[in-house]
Amino acid sequence: MHAIMLKAKLHRAQVTHSVLDYEGSCAIDGEWLDLAGIREYEQIQIYNVDNGERFTTYAIRGEEGSRIISVNGAAAHKAGVGHRLIICAYAHYSEAELANFKPHVLYMGADGELSHTSNAIPVQVA
């Protein structure tokens, strides 16, 4: 049996560019892609915290150190500059792989900079 699990997440990444007349995709700072373990051209799910839009696209590598999050092509209608996004990548894992599974989570601060990383999401309390 295989399970589809959260592989990586950029939590509350801030859109720096929204380019309608681009081929498509989402450009993400190369440093953040590496930290999260997201590959260039890998499918990603994007959840817009500000307007509730949810869509699928693929990641492309942005200039390292640029702090770019650019939503491109038709997806530019779903996220504008300044919007906060949750960007997720999922993967299939075997039962054996699940024994040591931990996602890569990058938490972004209000200033658009990386705040901290984690391999777990905190338990939600009532």
Swiss-Prot record:
Gene3D superfamilies: 2.40.40.20. The keyword Isomerase does not apply. SUPFAM superfamilies: ADC-like. It catalyses: L-aspartate + H(+) = beta-alanine + CO2. The keyword Zinc-finger does not apply. Binds 1 pyruvoyl group covalently per subunit. Is synthesized initially as an inactive proenzyme, which is activated by self-cleavage at a specific serine bond to produce a beta-subunit with a hydroxyl group at its C-terminus and an alpha-subunit with a pyruvoyl group at its N-terminus. The modification Pyruvic acid (Ser) is found at S25. The active site is at S25, Y58. InterPro entries: Asp_de-COase-like_dom_sf, Asp_decarbox. Substrate binds at T57, G73, A74, A75. One of its GO terms (molecular function) is aspartate 1-decarboxylase activity. GO terms for biological process: alanine biosynthetic process; pantothenate biosynthetic process. It holds the Pfam family Asp_decarbox. Belongs to the PanD family. Catalyzes the pyruvoyl-dependent decarboxylation of aspartate to produce beta-alanine. HAMAP family: PanD (MF_00446). This is Aspartate 1-decarboxylase. It comes from Stutzerimonas stutzeri (strain A1501) (Pseudomonas stutzeri).
